[in-house]
Swiss-Prot record:
PANTHER family: TY1 ENHANCER ACTIVATOR (PTHR31313:SF81). Keywords: DNA-binding, Metal-binding, Nucleus, Phosphoprotein, Transcription, Transcription regulation, Zinc. Its main location: nucleus. SUPFAM superfamilies: Zn2/Cys6 DNA-binding domain. The keyword NADP does not apply. GO terms for molecular function: DNA-binding transcription factor activity, RNA polymerase II-specific; RNA polymerase II cis-regulatory region sequence-specific DNA binding; zinc ion binding. GO terms for cellular component: nucleus. The modification Phosphoserine is found at S598. It is found in: Nucleus. Disulfide bonds: none annotated. This is Uncharacterized transcriptional regulatory protein C1683.13c. GO terms for biological process: DNA-templated transcription; negative regulation of transcription by RNA polymerase II; regulation of nitrogen utilization.
Length: 618
């Protein structure tokens, strides 16, 4: 066989593995194409497409060993009890396995394709609004609008619009200057977009530039700008945050809920996150709960491919999927923070995972307008960019599916054997998740490469979930039995990893990119460190003091964006003071953390007191 001549070595790609022929013959390969061995023998040089198999992490192997050990103990226990008790134990375990299979079987049922008749279409400012009715609805299917009656919205041709034209959007008592709006949008999409990816950035900006569209509304604009104002270094802009949020809240409640659409749901989610981050937990829980209810009302829990709406574009369908998974993710994270049951369940949905949306060339002109004002928006011109951002979103969704299992299976009353099986099973799933994430999202304590902020945040969230799943029920380390001490060591390892991630994060990034859920991550690690202090080992005590200092400093910086973090920091200090075991240690001057708030000020903040309590059972 005649081989192609080799190109210049400098211009050739170097593969990560040897070619197939060299590997089979166990000879040295220069990993070029073709390699010098194949050229020498005049043979075809072939590189397999499959990536290198990574060795299973130690933690994943240990999790599997825990599961095997549990089932061995379960079988031995079965052998020692009577037949009646055996039947009950087997039935409990069997019910758990069956429920898991039903809950997480993602294969859509054939009946899903017939759900079209349970939708009706409502006109909404020339845009489509879907309203879903289930099989038990009181509205006759014959009265529902058919798909042939749905108007098709076609986007107008892009045209250059002067800045002054945009001011017509704000004919309200409060006037938002275009330059201010532009700067706040730039801050939001550059610093916080990875925490709000249920808002499809590219098409929101396009419709904003056009003055209207299905992915833009004034209440969503003001809600987004209120987040941008929270992270602004300019005090004048920061003071605008409450005003903008109040306007968005009034508009969405007075007008948006009359005929809600995608932007109504997105606005409620943005406002919900903002209110929780400010410490107004009831208001945040209310707004997010309204958004989760809208998911069912708008039929977002059903995959658009199972409808018969041929006029819906791929982008329309993908935005609906992204909105659903955004709601699903926030539902789990908020429920995790509050210790409450989730509102959205996988068994009620057949929505496929979202994907990376294509960048459209027509967006260049709107993006250029933002770039003329500031370089803050320059990163956006790459479209929905950097595959790592989308991969971060997709893998966070998969992690939240495991969190959902933890919330529904672990934190509720069950028999001890089934509860232990659930914990072991979920712990194994978490280890499998961390082992299977893409290479660009991988991180470990020995990583030398530069790591993005989203990767660090994803690993912080993962380790906080490990802590919550395995943390002991008693805060006194000396009262833990051998099994609880083993699981506590898992928590201690994750807490140390979170501290290390924090140190790496703040060396390069600032608090502007931190999500609201960071407060829960930090306090979860702090709780384990406080338990470790009860072990009364001097060497560990010094390390714990340093770790608590790092966490409280991080929360104090985060409080510039999310005020709730300052309450969390004060609560950690209060809990630390209660850990002191001698009058000398109770002396404020001897505390290594150099702040001493009064007890009236830090008695316990209501919004996060569950973090320092045993696992919530509901």
């Amino acid at each position: 066989m005649q081989m192609k001549p080799r190109q210049d070595k400098k211009n050739q790609e170097i593969f990560r593995i040897s070619c197939q022929r060299c590997r089979q013959r166990k000879i040295k390969c220069d990993r070029l194409h073709p390699c010098f061995q194949c050229v020498k023998s005049n043979s075809q040089c072939f590189y397999p497409e499959d990536p290198i198999r990574r060795r299973a992490p130690k933690e994943y192997v240990e999790a599997l060993e825990r599961q095997i050990a549990f089932f061995e103990a379960f079988v031995k226990k079965l052998a020692k009890v009577g037949s009646d008790e055996q039947s009950l134990m087997i039935q409990d375990m069997n019910n758990k396995i069956v429920n898991e299979g039903n809950e997480y079987d993602q294969t859509p049922d054939i009946s899903a394709r017939k759900r079209r008749k349970h939708f009706r279409m409502l006109p909404q400012n020339n845009f489509r609004y879907f309203q879903f009715y289930g099989t038990t609805n009181v509205i006759s299917a014959s009265n529902l609008t058919t798909t042939s009656e749905i108007p098709t919205f076609k986007f107008p041709i892009f045209s250059k619009r002067k800045y002054n034209d945009t001011e017509n959007l704000y004919e309200q008592p409060f006037h938002l200057e275009f330059d201010t709006c532009q700067e706040l949008l730039s801050l939001f999409f550059l610093k916080q977009y990875h925490n709000f990816m249920f808002v499809f950035r590219d098409y929101f900006i396009r419709d904003f530039e056009l003055g209207g569209g299905p992915y833009y509304s004034q209440w969503l604009l003001f809600a987004i700008c209120s987040i941008g104002a929270m992270i602004s270094p300019d005090d004048d802009l920061k003071n605008l945050s409450n005003t903008l949020a109040n306007i968005a809240e009034k508009w969405v409640l007075d007008e948006g809920l009359n005929s809600p659409d995608i932007t109504t749901l997105q606005t409620l989610l943005v406002l919900g996150i903002r209110e929780i981050g400010r410490g107004l937990t009831f208001k945040g829980w209310l707004f997010s709960g309204m958004a989760f209810r809208l998911v069912y009302d708008m039929g977002l829990h059903l995959d658009p491919d199972h409808w018969d709406h041929s006029e819906e574009s791929r982008i329309d369908r993908e935005v609906r999927r992204r909105c659903f998974w955004g709601c699903f993710t926030l539902d789990k994270l908020i429920s995790l923070c509050y210790g409450r049951p989730p509102g959205l369940y996988l068994k009620q949905t057949d929505v496929r995972n979202t994907t990376q949306l294509p960048y459209i060339s027509e967006l260049d002109e709107p993006f250029e307008i933002f770039n003329k004002k500031s370089e803050l928006f320059a990163a956006v011109s790459a479209g929905e960019d950097r595959r790592g951002l989308v991969q971060f979103w997709l893998n966070q969704v998969e992690l939240c599916k495991i969190i959902h299992r933890m919330l529904t299976e672990v934190f509720e009353d069950r028999t001890s054997s089934v509860l232990e099986a659930s914990i072991n099973n979920i712990h194994t799933e978490l280890q499998k998740w961390i082992a299977d994430i893409p290479m660009e999202l991988q991180w470990n304590t020995r990583s030398q490469k530069e790591t993005s902020s989203t990767v660090l945040l994803l690993h912080m969230l993962y380790h906080s979930v490990i802590i919550i799943l395995n943390r002991p029920s008693d805060d006194n380390y000396l009262k833990l039995d051998n099994t609880e001490r083993y699981t506590f060591e898992i928590c201690w390892k994750s807490a140390k990893t979170i501290v290390q991630l924090l140190k790496i994060y703040f060396k390069k990034y600032d608090a502007d990119c931190l999500p609201m859920t960071f407060i829960h991550i930090a306090t979860s690690a702090a709780r384990i460190i406080l338990v470790k202090l009860n072990e009364n080992i001097p060497e560990d005590g010094d390390v714990c003091n340093i770790y608590l200092e790092i966490i409280t400093n991080a929360l104090d910086v985060c409080a510039n964006v999310w005020p709730l973090a300052s309450q969390a920091s004060r609560a950690i200090l209060n809990a630390y003071k209660s850990c002191a075991t001698s009058p000398k240690e109770n002396n404020e001057d001897s505390l290594p953390l150099q702040r001493s708030p009064s007890l009236d000020d830090v008695s316990r903040f209501d919004s996060l007191d569950y973090i320092f309590s045993p696992n919530v059972k509901y």
